[in-house]
Amino acid sequence: MMRLLLLLFSINAFAHISSGVDVFFQEKKYESLNGKRIAILTNHTGVNSKMRSTIELFLEHANEYEVVALFSPEHGIQGQHYAAESIDHSHENKIPVYSLHGKTRRPTPEMLEGIDVIVYDMQCTGVRAYTYPTALFYIMEEASKHNIEVIVLDRPNPIGGLTVDGPMLEDKWRSYIGYINVPYCHGMTIGELASFFNEEYNIKCDLQVIPMKGWKRSMSYRDTGLAWIPPSPNIPEPDTPLFSSSTGILGELGILNIGIGFTLPFKIVGAPWIKAKEFAEKLNGQKLPGVFFQPFYFRPFFGLYKGLDCEGILIQITDPKIYRPLSVQYLLLGMLKSLYPKEFLKRLETTSGKDLFCKANGTDAVYEILLKEKYAVWKLIEIHQEERKAFLEKRKKYLIPSYN
């Protein structure tokens, strides 16, 4: 018992910010729900700074309102399901849990019947290609049709609020893993994204965002003092999102092992046909800011190249504030093509992962440049540069002032 008390004290003592759910209950904003029937879209990451479940908090204060439904995203309400796994409806605390990653990804009229308010509280990864924000956007679209209020309890962007990098989303590649036209790394919180989506896409949802207190755009997740709960099985640490923003898309090609199936998800890139020392030396010779590439040797336990000796690199981020995730991705791809053209292009041309790769990128330009351009790196870096500049201007009015 004493150990548990010490743990809870230490978590609370080092929390430097208050997340949206903290603010909601500290300031008794739940009183605005009196007389209403509410639903909550959340999962295991929905906790306050003392590690108390968002569901538990809403139920504890449900004297004048009623929690009538829960919605769960990819990986399920407890986070134990695999990526892309179809999940059935269930019950939690005798409340129906409607899965939005099973037979339907949108709440049906039957699910929404009698609901006055839907609350969203989940930790995402700070990149466009992640299904949790899309689950919210689908909720907002359906809520607008049924005159249901949506409350978003804001949370930190684990990549920070200053990194804006990567391609925009072209309409052709709009999908559940990338639904709105923002850069791959957008530098916005989920609350800011919700406001952006509501206005830019003319959703007209009755939206309320509960901002955090104390969070600043320059913060890393560790700076917040909040405990990190892995939002999905392969995002185990608070710095993993920064690595996954560089290598996650590479994994969709199905030709490189990116640490899925090993102990370092998203932090390594390798294959049996790569020479580690040569690859690392050429990458480091480009002197990208904030990163060092260490030669690395490994044998995956499962997944791509299971049981085979692989060589590649371990990404060491030396300065997160100047690290450019997509520049790293493009350098990795361009250097692989330059050093191992036969092996790389043969696999690129025949991969079954082209569609997922383009959906994650939000464009097929990356794939086409890799296929056709002899010197691909700088062509890749130039993708959507002007569009990103325009986005930086457009997003300004949606940024929460207290975060600056």
Summary of predicted features, one role per range:
Residues 78-83, 151-173:
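Glycine-rich, charge-decorated loop segments at or immediately adjacent to ligand/cofactor-binding or catalytic sites
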Residues 83-115, 127:
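Glycine-rich oxoanion-binding loops at beta->alpha junctions
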Residues 124-136:
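Glycine/threonine-rich flexible loop motifs
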